[in-house]
Each structure stands twice: as C-alpha cells, then as structure tokens.
Amino acid sequence: MASASSPEGASSSSPEKVKMVTVLSIDGGGVRGIIPATILAFLEKELQKLDGPDARIADYFDVVAGTSTGGLLTAMLTAPNENNRPLFAADELAKFYIEHSPSIFPQKNWVLSKIAGTLRMVSGPKYDGKYLHSLLREKLGDTRLDKALTNVVIPTFDIANLQPTIFSKFELKYKPLKNALLSDISISTSAAPTFFPAHYFETKDDNGQTREFNLVDGGVAANNPTLCAMSQVSKYIILEDKEDCDFFPVKPTEYGKFMVISIGCGSNHDQKYKAKDAAKWGIFNWLIKGSSAPIIDMFTSASADMVDIHLGVLFSALQCEKNYLRIQYDQLTGSAGSIDDCSKENMDNLVKIGEMLLDKNVSRVDLETGHYVDVAGEGTNRDQLAKFAKQLSDERRRRQNEPSN
C-alpha cells in the first residue's frame, strides 16, 4: 500500500502503522480475465472518488496475488512505469484483453479452427504462445519482481520438481534467485497445459549462482491464490525480525486482521460429467470433450473451490465474514465458459457479465452443493466494493497520517 503521490510500495509501511493486512486475489481463467478486469475498474473508480484521479489499485493493497490470467492482471497492476507508478490503470485492463486476445488465441474459420486446434492439442500445445511472450516482454520489459509497487504473489508449477513454485516479493530477502523478470513469471503462470507451451528460464544472483525454472500454469497448484497470499504474509511475519516486519504486531493466526477481496473469472458448475460416461473415457476424452478439457476443468475448479470453501469456513469461524468478499459467477454457459473464445461477441459478453456481477447480491459458496447462494442483508457486490473502497481509503490515510516512531 502506498501513497498515490509516492513511489514507495506497500513494504514501506512501518510496523506500528499496520492494523489491517489488505489482500487482493485474482483467479485464473484465460480470456475470462475480462470479468475481474471489469470489476477492478469499478473498484479503482470508487477509490478515485475518495482520493483523486491518480489513485491506483496498487496503492491500497499490501498484497496483490494472481494465478494464470490473474497473474497477468497482477503484473499489469503492480509493474512500475517510467514514473514509478502502475503501468496500467484498472480501466485499461479489459481493453487490453479485447485488443490482444485475438492474437494470443488466434482462431480463423470456426469449424476449421476447432478441428485444427484439436489436432494440435494431440501433438502439442494448441497455441505457440509467441505473441503472448513478445507482448509481455514488450510491456513489462526488464522489470523484476523486486520492483513491483507492492507485495506480489504469483503461483506457478515446476514440472521438473513436481511442486508449486510461488513467486513472492516477500521471499526475495531469503531467496534472491526467485527475483525473476515479471515477464517470465507472467508467461509461466499462464502456460496452461495443452493450451500453451511450458516455459523455461534461468535466474542469476549477485554471487553468480543460477537457478533453472521449468514452469507451467499456476492453476495446476492454486487457481484461486487467496490462501497462498495469506500464507505468504503469515510466513513473512514468522520469519522477519519484528523491527523490520511491515505487518507486526499482526499475529499469523489473527486472520480477522485480514481484509480480502477475491475475484474469480467465472465457472460453469452446470456442465457436469457422469461417472457412467467418464468410465469409458480414454486419454483423449479426458483431455478433449466437445469444447472443453475435462481434466483441466476439474483440477482448476477443484483448487479454486477448495480455497473458497476453506476461507469461507475460516472467516465464519472467526466471526469476521465482512472482512472477506468473494466475487464469483458459477453459471457461465456456452462460449462464456471457454478460456480461449476471443470472438468479439464473447468478449463483449464477458464485459457484460462483469457488469452484471457487480449488481448481483453478495454470495458465498454453499458447503453442501458447491454453488453460490445469496447472503441476506449484504446488498450487492457493487455496494460491498464501495464499502471496501472506503475502508481501504481510510486505512491508507491512517497509515499516512500516523507519525512514525
């Protein structure tokens, strides 16, 4: 969290100033990133109403976390420009997707494209990723993780070690070899198996030591990175010296002192598979079934939903549900549920879904059915985001006005 007029990031807050840890988390979901982009544009406008036109998302959150397309949004919101301010304003994000997605996910004739895409997925990734790679390198340049304007957490999965690799600004003091280019991190977290190629790169520290990374989409490990972000904060609090820790005296178990906004890219819980049908599937059907990839749909939905369920129970048990706002739409149908349908019609529809989601009632996941149900008396997501914006603004002003010791 930083002043809109200051180049300093969240880590500049002194220990006595932090009473609430503010977290923004963005799920993965391909071109459906237009949905959270639309919601974030509204949130930033609310912050600008309170603090002026220069206010940016990165000024208000101690941690911004994102997986896959959420990782791209995270990098765009927190990477510095030549004035050490966020590279993108939130209202530019959806426009960025609409402009570049057709080149990231190139599709020609629909029928021929579907056949060709299926054939490519049998022998290699559906897309070569060249446009995405060049675009990210152009936009993010040589900016490394340590230059992000606030603390950033972006999950990936290392296929050489078969374990998650989390790029966290919190860890750089102890793990300098993770200080990778934001472009490499963004390419890696969005390298969805069967859609984009795995990404390899190396880093080198000041002592000449190197580390190799063999990475794929962070959604394999944590498609909803909220819990990952909160865990990084807790680990930081435990490891850091009290006089250096930005979040002291927040105790690692005091989740009631977290203020969390978690935004999904939408899902389709109505598209179910039957055991009788799946029992007959071979490798091909698990990877490609109609316009979807069942195995990928399952692990990304499972990882995201498990986090949502866990956090719902946690904040409820601590009687601080109002500190956790999850915005997700689980009734996507047709092309809207695709991660790579970048037709103008579908992208325009995703913008409308994001706007519609703002006016839907606040909802929480039902632990029995897995569906989202309205929460009585909480109003709409638009109402809650406006309230959160006021709290974020108040917390930022309090930190700015409280004298340092």
Curated annotation (Swiss-Prot):
PNPLA domain span: 24-230
Motif DGA/G, chain ranges: 217-219
UniProt enzyme class: hydrolase
Chain positions of motif GXSXG: 66-70
Pfam family, one: Patatin
Domain of life of the native organism: Eukaryota
GO biological processes: defense response; lipid catabolic process
E.C. designation(s): 3.1.1.-
GO-annotated molecular function: monoacylglycerol lipase activity; phospholipase activity
Motif (GXGXXG): 28-33
Segments forming a coiled coil: none
Catalytic machinery residues: S68, D217
InterPro entries: Acyl_Trfase/lysoPLipase, PNPLA_dom
Keyword annotations from UniProtKB, A to Z: Hydrolase, Lipid degradation, Lipid metabolism, Plant defense
Family: Belongs to the patatin family.
Domain notes: The nitrogen atoms of the two glycine residues in the GGXR motif define the oxyanion hole, and stabilize the oxyanion that forms during the nucleophilic attack by the catalytic serine during substrate cleavage.
Its job: Possesses non-specific lipolytic acyl hydrolase (LAH) activity. Hydrolyzes phospholipids as well as galactolipids. May play a role in disease resistance.
Protein name: Patatin-like protein 2
Organism: Oryza sativa subsp. indica (Rice)
